[in-house]
Amino acid sequence: MLRSNTARLALAAVLGWQLFAIIPAQASSHMDAPLISLDDPANTTDVYAFKSKSGGIDYLTTALGVYPFEEPGVGPNNYRFDDTVIYDINVALGNSTTSGRTDITYRFEFQTRFANENTVLQSYLGVVGGRRLFAPKQNLRQFYKVTKIDRRTGNVTVLGDQLKVPPNNQGRVTPFYNQGNDGDNPAQEGARTVAGLDAYTKLAIFPLNRNYQVFAGQRDDGFFADIQSIFDLDFSFSKPQPFDSQGGFNIHMVVLNIPLTELAGSSAVGVYATTSRRDASGAVKQVARQGNPLFVEALIPLKDKDRYNISRPTADEAFRDYAANPELSAVLGVQPISPGLLETIFIPDLIKVDLTTPPARLSGEAGFNRLSVFGGDVLPSTATGGNVAGGWPNGRRFGDDVIDIAVIALGAAGNGPDFSNTNVDKVTENDITYNQVFPYAATPLNGRVHQHHN
């Protein structure tokens, strides 16, 4: 039995497409499973998916992060996308959100070149100018191709090729990422307009055929939480200052704006991502998978974590019991706020997005709340005729506090009815503000000026 009106609204918001027939006739610790933890360029960190609007066009914004815990100041700074890894963002349309079937795949493939190999210098030969990508002093240069694969028809369409990745933010040699265009200053905070973006990011946003937009490059790690206290089973969160486990680290990220006109009129979609490598025979082998935050880390036991990473959402019935009877419920002595709630979120493991709402509120905008529905952040849904969650688990936005949202859903934040002040791990925001325009993810942190865990 639901405990309050708030819980009823939460359940309706989370389960909307099932309770109200929406479909027509992971934060992560970044070390999700044993094997993939040994393969940084293919190790997925987080997936984001939410409805947005830009230039009068309605989009499904999707993003995939890889390469966890990039230390901004390490030298030589050689973090990059791997030429031998295939990065896929997968979309399930309509009824496929229930079965987990992939209908469309957006594939990202990279190629690395060096302008000068007769030098000990790797990424940079000096200060990288901010007027064009691959300026003379940018030695490490990555190109990429974006391909749309329609699994329903078999059609393959190249949306863009020879697209360019901006340099990493090393500091003095990449001054235009940083406040005042000074490499000795911290990274630029989030922009509210395209004009306000740093020079390198602006140059790396590419329009593609059919109104797609894409960005690929280094970003700040936008996941925030005291992961150590959770997975050490300490749960004290008693430090006088919040401990953001991902604070001060960067990642690499691909961000794709998908026009809703490309999604076959679906009122709901499900999004997940995979990374794959080719074996000796040339066959593509999946090595990692990411959907909702926390599923692998907090619900799937050790014996099945690697199995999850090489499987598809269509096989997620095998993991249903882990969502129905989570081990953490026994550890904490609690029950989810509603029977079946976690199963609806995680089985199949897709980030489900209601596309009949207005665009999602972005972090920093009026009405945005890090707790999504539990903080009163809801959106009207044409499909349900009511309200649905403004953020995760209806999509996932940059700034959604997925730890606190999950703790509430698990029943570990008390009986309510008001969850709006929930602050389990005392980490309530990212270490740098997000952009309110594409690519939304925050500026990568300066290699010379950054702090960890604050």
Language-model features: locations:
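C-terminal segment of classical bacterial N-terminal signal peptides
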Residues: 16-26
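Residues at the start of alpha-helices and the adjacent loop-to-helix junctions
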Residues: 5, 17-19, 41, 434
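Surface-exposed extracytoplasmic segments
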Residues: 26-454
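Bacterial N-terminal signal peptides that target proteins for export
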Residues: 1-10
